[in-house]
Amino acid sequence: MARIAGINIPDHKHTVIALTSIFGIGKTRSQAICAATGIAEDVKISELSEEQIDKLRDEVAKFVVEGDLRREVTLSIKRLMDLGTYRGLRHRRGLPVRGQRTKTNARTRKGPRKPIKK
């Protein structure tokens, strides 16, 4: 297994699909990485030479991925909560942030129903 950005990339998958196993790299970005390195998208990771894998590592290193990206997202949400913005309050209360209705639905964010005690 090739190791890129601290993640074991699956050998049996095509390069474009395998790169998406890294947090922060989706299909479009993985296609751009393949184009920049000159590696065909339909080549499997196991068929790549060590030199090609090094090229992929260098290209992926240009982006914010994995732990750094997770930390960045967490800090931006924490910043919203500290500022006391509306979005921060919604995050703190565990409610939908982007204006969805909450009278019905929103069960994923709100959690299981709490029965009314008589």
UniProtKB/Swiss-Prot annotation:
GO CC terms: cytosol; small ribosomal subunit
Protein's GO biological process: translation
One Pfam match: Ribosomal_S13
SUPFAM superfamilies: S13-like H2TH domain
Keyword annotations from UniProtKB, A to Z: Ribonucleoprotein, Ribosomal protein, RNA-binding, rRNA-binding, tRNA-binding
InterPro entries: Rbsml_uS13_C, Ribosomal_uS13, Ribosomal_uS13-like_H2TH, Ribosomal_uS13_bac-type, Ribosomal_uS13_CS
Spans annotated as Disordered: 92-118
One example GO MF annotation: tRNA binding
Gene3D superfamilies on file: 1.10.8.50, 30s ribosomal protein s13, domain 2
Keyword Repressor: no
Similarity-based family: Belongs to the universal ribosomal protein uS13 family.
NCBIfam families associated with the record: uS13_bact
Subunit record text: Part of the 30S ribosomal subunit. Forms a loose heterodimer with protein S19. Forms two bridges to the 50S subunit in the 70S ribosome.
Physiological role: Located at the top of the head of the 30S subunit, it contacts several helices of the 16S rRNA. In the 70S ribosome it contacts the 23S rRNA (bridge B1a) and protein L5 of the 50S subunit (bridge B1b), connecting the 2 subunits; these bridges are implicated in subunit movement. Contacts the tRNAs in the A and P-sites.
Name of protein: Small ribosomal subunit protein uS13
Organism: Pectobacterium carotovorum subsp. carotovorum (strain PC1)
Gene name for this UniProt entry: rpsM
